C-alpha cells in the first residue's frame, strides 16, 4: 500500500495491458502495525479495480526476540519466493528506487562492509528458484509519488519509514 509499491503496480497494470501475460501483486502483512489489515484490504480493492491478481501473505512475528525489522524482511522475501515457486512465477519485481539504493550503500558502509558489500543493489538478483527484479532503481521517489497523484491514486504512509530506530 506504500507509494513505491503502488506505483510499480500501476506501471505493471499498463505493461500487462499492452503486453499480456500473467502478473500478480503480493501484499505481505507483517502484523506489526494496527493499520496493516486495512492497508492490505485497500490494496486488494485497488488491484481488483485494476484487474490484477492479488494475494495477501501473512507473517506473524514471534514475541521478544529483537531484530524485528531484519526478521520481517527475511520473512517477507521467504514468503514471496515460496509463493512465486508454488504459482509458477520466476520473476519477483520489487519497488526499490534510487533513494533505497543510496540508503543501502550508507547502511552497509556503517556496518563496515568491504568493497563487494558496498556494491549497489543489482537490477536482477537470483534468489533460490526465482529472480528478484528491481525495475525502479533509477526512479526518484518524488517521481513515483507524482505519478500516483496525477492518476488520483491514494497510498498508505508507513509511519515507521520516518523512524530512525531501525536500520533497513
What is the meaning of each model-derived region?
Residues 3-168:
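Core alpha/beta nucleotide-donor-binding catalytic domains of modification enzymes
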Amino acid at each position: 500500500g506504500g507509494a513505491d509499491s503502488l506505483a510499480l503496480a500501476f506501471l505493471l497494470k499498463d505493461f500487462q495491458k499492452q503486453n499480456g501475460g500473467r502478473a500478480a501483486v503480493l501484499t505481505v502483512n507483517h502484523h506489526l502495525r494496527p493499520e496493516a489489515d486495512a492497508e492490505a484490504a485497500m490494496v486488494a480493492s485497488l488491484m481488483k479495480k485494476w484487474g490484477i491478481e492479488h494475494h495477501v501473505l501473512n507473517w506473524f512475528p514471534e514475541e521478544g526476540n529483537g531484530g524485528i525489522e531484519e526478521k520481517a524482511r527475511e520473512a517477507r522475501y521467504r514468503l514471496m519466493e515460496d509463493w512465486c515457486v508454488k504459482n509458477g512465477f520466476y520473476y519477483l519485481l520489487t519497488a526499490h528506487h534510487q533513494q533505497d539504493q543510496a540508503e543501502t550503500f550508507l547502511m552497509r558502509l556503517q556496518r563496515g562492509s568491504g568493497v563487494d558489500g558496498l556494491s549497489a543493489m543489482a537490477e536482477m538478483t537470483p534468489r533460490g528458484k526465482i529472480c528478484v527484479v528491481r525495475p525502479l532503481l533509477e526512479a526518484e521517489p518524488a517521481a513515483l509519488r507524482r505519478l500516483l497523484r496525477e492518476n488520483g491514486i491514494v497510498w498508505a504512509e508507513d509511519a515507521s519509514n520516518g523512524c530512525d530506530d531501525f536500520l533497513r
